[in-house]
Curated annotation (Swiss-Prot):
Any single biological process term in GO: photosynthesis
Family the entry assigns: Belongs to the Ycf4 family.
Protein name, UniProt field: Photosystem I assembly protein Ycf4
Membrane-crossing residue ranges in chain numbering: 19-39, 57-77
Membrane topology term: Multi-pass membrane protein
This protein's UniProt keywords: Chloroplast, Membrane, Photosynthesis, Plastid, Thylakoid, Transmembrane, Transmembrane helix
Protein location: Plastid, Chloroplast thylakoid membrane
Pfam families, per database record: Ycf4 (PF02392)
Function noted in UniProt: Seems to be required for the assembly of the photosystem I complex.
Keyword flag Transport: no
Coiled-coil blocks: none
GO cellular component, one term: photosystem I
Length: 184
């Protein structure tokens, strides 16, 4: 989602609160909870899951392995739920021609550097760069080359944009910032 006027362009980024992340976190949580319940019920000899008799799984080695996978899955699931609740990766890109400033803001993990805020002068921007990687896992990423700072990615690597969409976005941004486009 973006908002544009004559002098200001603001690009909002979603971050980790995507439907696919919610689905994966829920599937992983339910699956690992099932594994842990099967492992625990085989240890206790009780039937906690009605459609899986506890007598089918002896505790050593199946029950231990199922419990281990359940606990590991719960840790990974809790990590996913934390990244969703903290909304890691969300933020905005703000290009202001009137003041001559570019601001890039992202939310990170909790701690000292939770707020990632970068500020550059528009005159320090050398170019807008498109990096294309072809093959089985084709990828198109948009970068902004800053003098003395290197390249800063503006699109996420998992943002499956078509070549036409990435070219359109790069052309609009380069026109707005009045800088050239490079393709690598």
């Amino acid at each position: 989602m973006s908002w544009r006027s004559e002098d200001i362009w603001i690009e909002l980024l979603t971050g980790s609160r995507k439907l696919s992340n919610f689905c994966w976190a829920l599937i992983l949580f339910l699956g690992s909870l099932g594994f842990l319940l099967v492992g625990t019920s085989s240890y206790l000899g009780r039937n906690w899951i009605s459609f899986v008799p506890s007598q089918q799984f002896i505790f050593f080695p199946q029950g231990i392995v199922m419990s281990f996978y359940g606990i590991a899955g719960l840790f990974i699931s809790s990590y996913l739920w934390c990244t969703i609740s903290w909304n890691i990766g969300s933020g905005y890109d703000r290009f202001d021609r009137k003041e001559g400033i570019v601001c890039i803001f992202r939310w990170g993990f909790p701690g000292k550097n939770r707020r990632i805020f970068l500020r550059f002068l528009i005159k320090d921007i050398q170019s807008v760069r498109i990096e294309v990687k072809e093959g089985l896992y084709a990828r198109h990423v948009l970068y902004m080359d800053i003098r003395g700072q290197g390249a800063i990615p503006l699109t996420r690597t998992d943002e499956n944009l078509t070549p036409r969409e990435i070219e359109q976005k790069a052309a609009e941004l380069a026109y707005f910032l009045r800088v050239p486009i490079e393709v690598f």
